Amino acid sequence: MTQTLTQRKKRTDRNHIIYELVVNGLNYIGVTAKTESTVNKSVLSRAAKHFYRAKKEDKNWLLCAELRKLSDKSEIEVYVHEVIRGKAAAHKREVEIRRMVCPVLNTDTRGD
């Protein structure tokens, strides 16, 4: 008797986190997938990626410009707004939050 393993379908409804970064008193709203064991670790990991990109890549985005003024990533204030199941729902809710909060450092305002 031969058994064949069937591939299970990859989940498409993972948790996403809507977060806020405060850099030099200016705020940024973003969304990221929950990739680490906890929500906080996932958001801190995403903030570290923002910091790395600002230092290593030549992006002229407002967020990157403000992050370059910092000496260490620990100077970034991180807040979690919501955890939402599903990518589409999370991005829709992020737009709603951006409209309410009016963050200064968001340059990509698709949906606003």
Q: What kind of region is each of these model predictions?
A:
Residues 1-41, 92:
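GIY-YIG nuclease catalytic motif and its immediate N-terminal context
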Residues 33-87:
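Conserved short loop/helix modules at catalytic or binding sites
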